[in-house]
């Protein structure tokens, strides 16, 4: 488990109204963030229904390995379904009437959206609409959903604030995430569905996605292949450790947005940045990987990739104000935890 790798487990306090009596839905439960959130809830004794399509965007064996770690928990059940399957999603919501839904499933990846745009419409738009409809018709009291720092698009003002304009996405993936925020706000306004959107900033850690930079770099370094450094390595990212993200999500579960005059058009909707508020030079992170893996990287310098940005930097003051916590795991500790898991999983 991630908490074991970092030796910093966080437990969810269970108050008088124990959530074990009703199930929490976690979509994308076999995915990177979804697995960690589901496991944290189960560790605290909650009942969790995990949903995932187990598609082949990346190796399904890794998704199954995560799922295999959740299956032994007595409070866990798994539903194999696609978000775009409207009847299946409607039946699931009608059966369980989830009080809290944590929606982390999506078609991810900026670069993949350049070549497979319809995947994003199916999962991120139609699939999200099915989740919203399920919440609307079945008494959901709080929908927490994943947005992305990519919604800031071509913004040059740093750090990125939740009050900044997000009207100029530079990838289809970012456009679908912005659309999710607008759709959620609409349902909050029309149907008084409380929604909380989380703009994630470069989440990493054990059980990482193999299409992400740190994982790709680690594989290439261990196999003696070049690593591709876009913008000639002149990139800065607000790397955020997954255990910090899990803690944010679980803290926000009981912080249900309310309608406040003069805010968000009176809708019970909130959006937060979830980042480490401390951008790291990409070359520094590569050096940390080299140190932890004990091997030098062969570096291939390339121009900027379409749809990418040179820097991300999260302003998390709104998050800290409302939940009293901000991600803060040092990059050195996080990379060490990731590499420890990577070595163990790949036996290298």
Model-derived regions: residue spans:
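N-terminal Rossmann-like NAD(P)+-binding domain of SDR-like oxidoreductases, especially those catalyzing
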Residues: 5, 11-203, 325, 337, ...
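Residue-level recognition of oxygen-bearing side chains
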Residues: 88, 119, 126, 165, ...
């Amino acid at each position: 488990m991630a908490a074991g790798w970092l030796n910093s487990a966080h437990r969810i306090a269970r108050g008088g109204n124990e959530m074990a009596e009703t199930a929490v839905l976690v979509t994308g439960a076999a995915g990177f963030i979804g697995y960690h959130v589901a496991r944290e809830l189960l560790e605290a004794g909650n009942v969790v229904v995990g949903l995932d399509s187990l598609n082949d965007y990346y190796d399904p064996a890794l998704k199954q390995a995560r799922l295999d770690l959740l299956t032994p928990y007595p409070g866990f059940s798994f539903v194999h379904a696609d978000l775009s399957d409207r009847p299946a999603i409607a039946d699931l919501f009608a059966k369980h009437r989830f009080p809290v839904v944590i929606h982390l499933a999506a078609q991810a990846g900026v670069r993949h959206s350049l070549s497979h745009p319809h995947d994003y419409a199916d999962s991120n738009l139609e699939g999200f609409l099915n989740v919203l409809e399920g919440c609307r018709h079945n008494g959901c009291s709080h929908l927490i959903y994943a947005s992305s720092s990519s919604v800031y698009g071509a913004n040059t003002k740093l750090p990125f604030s939740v009050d900044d304009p997000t009207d100029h996405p530079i990838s289809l993936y970012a456009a679908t995430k912005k659309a999710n925020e607008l759709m959620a706000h609409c349902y909050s306004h029309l149907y008084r569905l409380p929604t909380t959107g989380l703009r994630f900033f470069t989440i990493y850690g054990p059980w990482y996605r193999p299409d992400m930079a740190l994982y790709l770099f680690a594989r290439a370094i261990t196999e003696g292949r070049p690593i591709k450094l876009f913008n000639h390595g002149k990139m800065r990212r607000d790397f955020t450790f997954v255990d910090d993200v899990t803690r944010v999500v679980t803290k926000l579960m009981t912080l249900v947005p309310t309608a406040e005059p003069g805010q968000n058009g009176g809708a019970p909707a909130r959006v937060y940045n979830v980042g480490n508020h401390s951008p790291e030079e990409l070359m520094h992170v590569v050096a940390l990987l080299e140190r932890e893996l004990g091997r030098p990287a062969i570096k291939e310098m390339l121009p900027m990739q379409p749809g990418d940005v040179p820097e991300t930097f999260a302003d998390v003051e709104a998050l800290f104000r409302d939940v009293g916590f901000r991600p803060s795991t040092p990059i050195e500790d996080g990379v060490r935890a990731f590499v420890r898991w990577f070595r163990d999983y790949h036996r290298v």
